[in-house]
């Protein structure tokens, strides 16, 4: 019996035919794990989702001839994946949906609604809160507090380095050797970083937005930019989603608004309604721990458990915020990181990005994505914390991950499946530069 290797295809690559033969392979030998290495595959691919399919040829052969079986190997999950593109200061962020598709959908919507009675606006467009998303808003708020409190404790046992000249950070006992510093006097240091201690704001980007008492009210003017408080963008999204915080009150309507124009409305009369009774929150709100109460984990088991809880809080916050963004619109400037939680952006002329003079400092508002609201700080993934240091010549073999994920991974947490491709956990790293030059 001979098996002919017909094609091997991974996600994003077209199949290629490379014929070779394996003689006298029985079913038991074929299912043996050692056969995986005799096919010429890397040992790192053994844990991947690889599908083997054997196809018999339809032609009849003589009794003395051996029948050839084409072997097709397919991988549903990519072995490695590039990070999202990082745009320079001179580039504008692309629209999540192309503007041509938006215009086409708008024309189709006007055509379908022609000569039809207007439907009542659903929440939150009618000024009311989506009641089914209120528990989710509380869950996202508490997940953010748990994430911050746990990171304070983990950063006492997992070293996080920050460059003193730029905003780059590195998770590990010492900084990486790559020449990627873009701060002042970088030419004198030849692009090398000067690593110092980091704080929690280096890991979680402190992205703030204006707090709106009425999300359907008038837009914030330029002269009001200092009189309106600013809160973390995720917190503002949770407040508009139904979270009650005494320091940041919000207007809660009990009747839908009455539209009198495209951009004009009046509030419905609520005088005949009884006074609302104060209701307890679905879950109690957590608070951030003071600095004096932050203690490192006492044992290795506690460190691993804390890392798992931190990673779970990170995933809950991102997944819940993504669901809230589907109902409560979030706007982002296409030129700078400014975020506004609301149906339309504010009018504050504080954009200092590329060619802001031509726009008189006004922001170019567009729909935001999850990474605009919760930007992940990508850092280099250290394959072995206790092993040899990272080499500058092997930079293309190392992967990257969000700083929170890398901290939890070095603390002992299991890396989620959707981060393994960018971290390149299944890519073999050469031990030396000479071995890397031998890689085809």
UniProtKB/Swiss-Prot annotation:
Family matches, as Pfam families: APO_RNA-bind
Gene Ontology annotations for the cellular component aspect, listed alphabetically: chloroplast
Cited InterPro entries: APO_dom (IPR023342)
Compartmental location: Plastid, Chloroplast
Basic and acidic residues bias spans: 106-115
Keyword terms, alphabetized: Chloroplast, Plastid, Repeat, Transit peptide
Function comment: May be involved in the stable assembly of several 4Fe-4S cluster-containing complexes of chloroplasts.
Protein's UniProt name: APO protein 2, chloroplastic
The species this protein was found in: Arabidopsis thaliana
Gene assigned in the entry: APO2
